[in-house]
A protein has these predicted regions:
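Nucleic-acid enzyme cleavage-core boundary/entry regions
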Residues: 1-175, 188-309
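Catalytic metal-binding/acid-base residues of hydrolase active sites
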Residues: 184
Length: 309
């Protein structure tokens, strides 16, 4: 069965009434409450479902409308800001601490046990866009895998830096890379270019295993993903007859696919074992912080010097 290709309609959309806007807002709220964080583009694709009471059109105009409602929902306080994922803008900070105890307390929460110590492979996740990366970031953190957003065709320096990190690690286990990107004439070339460049820079002893886990042709049919006609001017990948953005796959589904793939590489009960180890080590770090916070007793000479002052 062929997936239907949606083309821009010719009918002019009538301005929504207050009741229709309220219904659209309710739909957006429900989607985000059920699963977050999501990018605005993920929410937009959910709002194009014709089965909804108030769907939006599959067009740039429809996206801008959803984007506008998402802004209003955040500003009104109806939707939490952190329900939206956005890695496109980040600040750069220098952390400072009031004391050694403050430092130990602050960094204790960053401690992670090595989930991959006894695994047969290493694992990384690459995504075509920061939009996708922002949605899967928390899962990558929980699973202790590095995440690299390409931003389209990735820069050679970015790939070289990632490969150099692998080469310098001293880890001789195979490297599994999972990739997520758009299925369109350009998108199906990005992961091929990435894999080729990684192989170019990785040392020969590093066995690279590369798998595109989304979006692929089978998923378009399996999940009934909305498609767009390919640009007639684009002469790349002529065997690709349509365009499907990675964000058209519901964020919850995408995260589930990723977790299943990554967890299959981990030893049995690795997450549970690591959690127990982390709790024990965190207790030691907390004890260390208390030791730094407690003034050390002065010896006799130090006490006399303090009295003289």
């Amino acid at each position: 069965m062929m997936t239907k290709i949606y083309r821009a309609g010719t009918l002019k959309r009538i301005r929504r009434t207050d009741a229709q806007l309220e219904q659209l807002d309710a739909q957006i709220f429900a989607v985000l409450k059920e699963d977050h964080p999501q990018s605005v583009l993920h929410v937009f694709y959910r709002m194009t479902d014709p089965r909804l009471p108030e769907p939006v059109e599959k067009s740039d105009k429809g996206y801008r409308h959803v984007q506008d409602r998402c802004v209003k929902l955040r500003r009104s306080g109806r939707v939490k800001y952190n329900w939206f994922a956005d890695l496109s803008r980040r600040g750069y900070f220098t952390n400072t601490y009031s004391s050694a105890a403050d430092f130990v307390t602050s960094v204790a929460g960053l401690y992670r046990a090595d989930l991959w110590r006894d695994a047969d492979t290493r694992c990384e996740v690459w995504s075509e866009s920061r939009s996708i990366a922002s949605v899967i970031l928390n899962d990558c953190k929980k699973l202790a895998v590095d995440l690299y957003p390409c931003g389209g065709f990735s820069s050679l320096s970015f790939i070289h830096e990632a490969a150099t990190s692998i080469n310098n690690s001293g880890d001789v286990r195979p490297l599994q890379v999972f990739y997520i990107g758009d299925y369109d004439p350009a998108g199906v070339l990005i992961d091929k270019s990435l894999e080729r460049e990684l192989r170019e820079h990785l040392r020969s002893r590093v066995e690279l295993r590369f798998e595109r886990i989304g979006i692929n042709a089978g998923q378009i049919e399996q999940y009934g993903l909305p498609t767009k006609p390919r640009k007639e001017s684009d002469k790349r990948s002529l065997h690709i007859g349509c365009a499907v953005e990675a964000e058209s796959l519901p964020a919850k589904t995408l995260r589930g696919i990723l977790r299943d793939k990554v967890e299959a590489l981990l030893p049995e009960n690795a997450l549970a074992v690591a959690k127990v180890a982390e709790e024990s080590e965190l207790q030691q770090l907390e004890l260390m912080a208390r030791m730094f916070a407690t003034p050390w007793p002065l010896d006799d000479d130090e006490a006399d010097a303090a009295d003289d002052e």
